[in-house]
Design a protein with these regions (language model features):
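Catalytic His-Asp segment of secreted/periplasmic serine-dependent ester chemistry enzymes
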Residues: 47-129
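A short helix->loop->beta-strand "cap" motif at the edges of active sites that frequently abuts
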Residues: 32-36
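Generic beta-sheet signal
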Residues: 40-42, 77
């Protein structure tokens, strides 16, 4: 029906996307006026502390975009993931949870991270002009 909600959430980068800058720039350019964008930072625990990894570089670029555009916000899943090592035990360090408790906890943390960014964006009220 060609309806796009005012707040758009985009998660990009856990699977290696070498042209992340180009893709993010295109998405921002094509985002219609009257909308805001929430970028969910990627997390890959295998390379989380490697500044040369694509996931880390993607996160850095997303943080830069949020500073550049007042209608772009960040749901920093990377930061949340780093702060909660308990959800990664027994996993591939990309997909949280190795049993019901940690799967549930990881899902709740992810949802809370995105919701906090949405709440902040809506409170600020800025959209693309």
């Amino acid at each position: 029906n060609k309806v796009l909600l005012e707040t758009v959430v985009l998660a990009l980068g856990t699977n290696t996307v070498d042209n992340y800058e180009s893709l993010l720039n295109q998405f921002i350019a094509k985002l219609p006026k009257g909308h805001r964008l929430i970028l969910v930072t990627p997390y890959d625990g295998r390379t989380a502390h490697d500044g040369t990894s694509i996931a880390v570089k993607t996160r850095q670029y997303e943080l830069e975009l949020a500073k550049k555009y007042d209608y772009v916000f960040v749901a920093d899943w990377y930061q949340t993931a780093i702060q909660h090592p308990e959800i990664w035990y027994g996993t591939d360090y990309v997909h949280f949870g190795s049993e019901t408790t940690t799967i549930t906890k990881g899902g709740e943390l992810y949802a809370q991270t995105v919701k906090q960014a949405i709440d902040e964006a809506v409170k600020k009220g800025t959209v693309k002009k």
